[in-house]
Design a protein with these regions (language model features):
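Short, glycine-/aromatic-enriched active-site segment of Class I SAM-dependent methyltransferases
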Residues: 95-118
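A short glycine-rich, Lys/Arg-flanked "PGG" loop and its adjoining helix->strand segment in the class I
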Residues: 74-89
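Short alpha-helix
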Residues: 119-135
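A short SAM/SAH-binding and catalytic strip from SAM-dependent methyltransferases
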Residues: 59-74
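Class I SAM-dependent methyltransferase SAM/SAH-binding core
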Residues: 1-49
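A short hydrophobic/small-residue beta-strand
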Residues: 15, 90-91
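Conserved Class I S-adenosyl-L-methionine
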Residues: 138-188
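A short acidic, Gly/Pro-enriched loop at the edge of an enzyme's catalytic core
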Residues: 49-61
Length: 188
């Protein structure tokens, strides 16, 4: 999607656009319309089932707004490291929490909180501790990104069936609990 367009247009990168939710044909048609089909290769991949790439192939493995759905175990990050060249990077940008709720979900968030959110929305400290367990990487950046409010505002103006519920959730959240997390690790 947009991250593929950015990487191709800004950096001239060749991108393997691995997606679980959008068909390769749909992505290819989009890439062709955008004039990037010569640099963007759409593929269907479920990262939890293994990746169809050679070890040491990639300079960068990047996940925007998806890693939290599948990368919440120490084993997942460890399984990705071999695909990145020594000196290359693994980078993610994901929604998260300013602090762990544990069993103390704030009252205003309880109507929206569910088991998927409990599993996938974690704090920066939680993610840093998880990534620190991995062998073969050095964490070079981990922070709360300043674009959290902008990212949510853009999402809330999108046409998607769950946006209506998310609007209510974000009104209740009021900027108190959510953040957007960036993690970058260098493969050593």
């Amino acid at each position: 999607g947009l991250s593929t367009l950015f990487l191709v247009k800004k950096y001239g990168a060749q991108v393997f656009a691995a997606d679980l939710w959008i068909s390769p044909t749909e992505n290819y048609e989009r890439f062709r319309t955008l004039g990037i089909d010569d640099k963007a290769i759409p593929i269907f991949v479920d990262a939890t089932k293994g990746l169809p790439f050679a070890h040491g192939y990639f300079d960068l493995m990047l996940s925007i707004d998806a890693y939290h759905y599948f990368g919440d175990t120490a084993e997942m990050l460890q399984s990705l490291i071999p695909f990145v060249k020594k000196g290359g990077h693994i980078a993610v940008a994901i929604p998260g929490l300013k602090y762990e709720f544990g069993k103390n979900v704030p009252d205003e968030m309880q109507p929206f909180w569910n088991s998927e959110m409990e599993r996938t929305l974690r704090s920066l400290d939680w993610w840093k501790a998880l990534w620190a367990k991995a062998q073969g990487i050095e964490i070079v950046d981990s922070r709360e990104m300043s674009c959290c409010r902008q990212a949510w505002e853009e999402w809330l103006t999108a046409y998607h069936p769950i946006v209506a519920e998310d609007i209510k959730m974000m009104e209740a959240e009021g900027g108190k609990y959510f953040n957007f997390i960036q993690l970058i690790a260098k493969v050593i």
